[in-house]
Amino acid sequence: MRVLQPLGIVIRLQSPQKYLAFEESQQRSAFLMKPDVTASRDGRVRWILDTKWKELSAGEAKEGVAQSDLYQMYAYASCYNCSEVVLLYPHHGALGQSAGVRATYLLNPWAERASQEPARRVRVATMDLADLKTVPRQLERIVLDYNAQAPVEIADGVPSHALR
């Protein structure tokens, strides 16, 4: 995505690849992970985007985001030491509002507090695919929104924004 190059952000498709585990008895890596899109700056993965082709449903709890998808995002965030991940779904008229970020979840913020690492965040977003020329700008908006986020502090097991 050329629109992010001036920010020093390097976009890669299904790269870098890492393994989630190591099988001790066979002495080999196991469970290859290939995130759909990674964005790096200064050689470090800053965010990961994973595309889903199922439709969200405004009438369902959590709009139908699968728990297994959150587990996958947690694995990516942990293995790539990345604090920002995105689940990206196609937008459709039944969702009502315009495309973009629909929900933000902190991934296991209590454990992160104990380790003194920043909380990991997953955003659920949609993209309007009706006009493919707008896709780069929609992605840019999601990325720039990440860059504008203040770090989340956890105090006594409660995210700081919940204290306001």
Residue ranges and their predicted role:
Residues 1-164:
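Catalytic core segments in nucleotide and nucleic-acid processing enzymes
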